[in-house]
Amino acid sequence: MAKAAKAPASFETALAQLEDIIQAMDSGDMPLETALASYKQGTELIKFCQGKLADAEQQLKILENNELKTLDLPNGQ
């Protein structure tokens, strides 16, 4: 029986885990079952990250009176 995956602590943690999965899968040395499990975990991490980004966008809309404005960063960052 498959165990439920624990949600990442943060967006940054999820992104780092996703990068690790991509790097491991790109190596081509992963057995099929491991690759399938990694793919599933990767899709769950992507959904988590998309949710966090959507939440952040919603917070920005609220802060800007429902008008999404361009964020000007100093020094072209």
From Swiss-Prot:
Catalytic activity entry: Exonucleolytic cleavage in either 5'- to 3'- or 3'- to 5'-direction to yield nucleoside 5'-phosphates
Cellular compartments annotated: Cytoplasm
BP-aspect Gene Ontology terms: DNA catabolic process
Pfam families according to UniProt: Exonuc_VII_S (PF02609)
EC number(s) from the headed UniProt entry: 3.1.11.6
GO molecular function, one term: exodeoxyribonuclease VII activity
Task of the protein: Bidirectionally degrades single-stranded DNA into large acid-insoluble oligonucleotides, which are then degraded further into small acid-soluble oligonucleotides.
Assembly with partners or alone: Heterooligomer composed of large and small subunits.
Family named by the database record: Belongs to the XseB family.
Protein known as: Exodeoxyribonuclease 7 small subunit
Organism, as annotated: Chromobacterium violaceum (strain ATCC 12472 / DSM 30191 / JCM 1249 / CCUG 213 / NBRC 12614 / NCIMB 9131 / NCTC 9757 / MK)
Lineage summary: Bacteria, Pseudomonadati, Pseudomonadota, Betaproteobacteria, Neisseriales
